[in-house]
């Protein structure tokens, strides 16, 4: 995990509430947030125990998350590193952002993978945005 003071500052400057929605447990989340210098940025956390250990991408988990934090579908965005976890949020009307490790590498690795990624992005229709640089993506949002 790469810490980023810049990303922490950008997240702090974003309007609206920010929540963590994870298949990990809360203890892991706390350790990661501490390492990233982001302990006081988020308004809440929904970890795997909150869903009785049912992970994303099950629809019921997103419904529970939405209900816990009383989210308005029209003003909710989901940032996720696994694109499959964006399908249900998209159906719910959320903006979806697929955060990849290295988009250029993923798109150019080989023909089959490039076609698969393009199919996911273009044909599946559940990804609103794709980025491999979260800091710059968020800078352009604010």
Locations of the language-model features?
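Short, acidic loop-to-helix structural element flanking the phosphoryl-transfer center
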Residues: 1-20, 26-30, 59
